[in-house]
């Protein structure tokens, strides 16, 4: 939101809807109504979704494509977690749906999440349409940032050409870590993980804990930091739908994860 508003644009939020099983889905009717009401010309798509961890199915993306194409909306597809779908799921790049979809899509990827290269600040912007590509290059030129750093380029190429073994091992580690956290959360009253299909992040619903402890959603981050000693991501930074949620990164050594879970369990027991 901050980046959009700094660029003097207006955010037209369309919250995801959580079903009875805790799975997040898009409200396409609400999306279309918002596009018609606001005249929005660009949609930011997170695929897989951060923070809720959905790996959108081809059918879901095709339905989204119908709406955006009908209204001439450009889709900026943030697919930085595309490599990190969990076993049983696979990321479908939005632009791969069809040539028509690719024509109004700007795809953003990077080796930073998959290969732990965020510090090198390198990413890939894929634009099939010539007009969109010219527009992007023109805007890029106005920033004065026209060339990525040499080390980042070298690392990016090495990761994509020679990083298969690393990525396979990472995916196994993340899947095991996620299952481990979900099992441990069964011992912690009032906190549960939303069903997750990808990324190395878990979206934790803490509403039960807050209710039991008599706390307000805005106090959650304070409890996590001061009582549990954990610096997690307050769900509110992701919008109103994040109230009562927090985000945790499971891509770390098992000992680190276990210590964090111990501190979380201890703090919840003490507060409630």
For the regions a protein language model found, what residue spans apply to each?
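PLP-dependent class I/II
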Residues: 1-272
């Amino acid at each position: 939101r901050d980046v959009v508003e700094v660029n003097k644009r207006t955010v037209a939020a369309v919250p995801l809807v959580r079903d009875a099983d805790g799975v997040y889905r898009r409200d396409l009717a609400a999306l279309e109504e918002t596009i018609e009401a606001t005249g929005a010309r660009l949609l930011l798509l997170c695929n897989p979704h951060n923070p809720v961890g959905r790996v959108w199915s081809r059918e879901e993306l095709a339905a989204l494509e119908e709406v955006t194409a009908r209204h001439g909306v450009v889709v900026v597809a943030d697919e930085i977690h595309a490599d990190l779908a969990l076993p049983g799921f696979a990321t479908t790049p939005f632009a791969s749906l069809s040539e028509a979809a690719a024509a109004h899509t700007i795809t953003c990827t990077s080796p930073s999440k998959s290969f732990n290269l965020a510090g090198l600040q390198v990413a890939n912007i894929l634009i099939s349409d010539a007009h969109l590509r010219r527009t992007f290059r023109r805007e890029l030129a106005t920033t004065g940032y026209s060339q990525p750093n040499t080390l980042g380029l070298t690392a990016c190429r090495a990761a994509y050409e020679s990083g298969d073994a690393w990525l396979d091992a990472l995916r196994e580690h993340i899947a095991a870590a996620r299952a481990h956290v979900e099992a441990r959360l069964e011992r912690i009253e009032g906190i549960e993980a939303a069903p997750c299909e990808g990324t190395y992040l878990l979206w934790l619903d803490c509403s039960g804990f807050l209710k039991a402890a008599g706390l307000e959603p805005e106090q959650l981050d304070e409890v996590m930091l001061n009582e549990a000693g954990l610096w997690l991501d307050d769900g509110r930074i992701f919008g109103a739908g994040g109230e009562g949620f927090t985000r945790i990164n499971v891509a770390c050594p098992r000992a680190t994860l276990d210590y964090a879970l111990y501190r979380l369990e201890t703090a919840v027991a003490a507060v409630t």
